[in-house]
Amino acid sequence: QTAKMLRQLMHMAQYVQSHALHFFHLASPDLLFGMDAEPAKRNVIGLIFEKPEIAVKGVMLRKFGQEIIEMLGGKKVHPSFAIPGGVNRALSPEQREKILQQVDGVIANFQFALDLIKDYYAQHGKEAANFASFSSGYLGLVDDNGNLELYDGKLRLRDEKGTILEDKVDPKDYLSIIEERVEDWSYLKFPYYKKWGYPRGIYRVGPLGRLNVVDGITTPLANKELREFKKLSINGIVEGSLFYHYARLIEALYAAEK
């Protein structure tokens, strides 16, 4: 159980640093400066000069996640930690206290980011609702109660209306519901829901896909945000691709709380 919790700790740290990197460094320049802004300004360097307080929050969030990875794995990139049956390193009491002392600030910074993205949607509601919005299936991991799971769960697939098509499928049995198509113009494979065929059976994954399949989140602040997120549509299925940012920050908040 201890080894599992340590693995989860590293995994949540990875979500914290990765989601912070995406939102603050990659996405926020587009959102804050406008997608038509000069490319020379519309980047993380422009963010540092124009809105340094926001840039610093992003840097510190990523630093927090990376430092946890380093504590457990010995290094920030390609850590050596998980081994068959457990882990190869413990967390010292001093390291645990260092993490705990920073958690409240990390949570507050993600709440700041959530306020930022919600302000953007309030000002660009029509654009957010219509940009790259299309019907598809959604696939993600859930726990036994249908809550968000980022570490170890079962597969759930919903359609665009919110109907559960497949539930509690063991990931090792994914080929029982998923097939892959090969196109001659791409090295990528195109997975789809086997019963519906291609292209009807295409589905989305990632933060938007995951929040569209879950019933709840097990941490209070992220679950409150999920309830608001679900109100963006009548049936709780959010289709606009610009809402990936919102979903990603809710996941980051969950990871920080977890």
Regions found by a protein language model. Name each.
Residues 1-258:
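Active-site bordering "gate/hinge" segments
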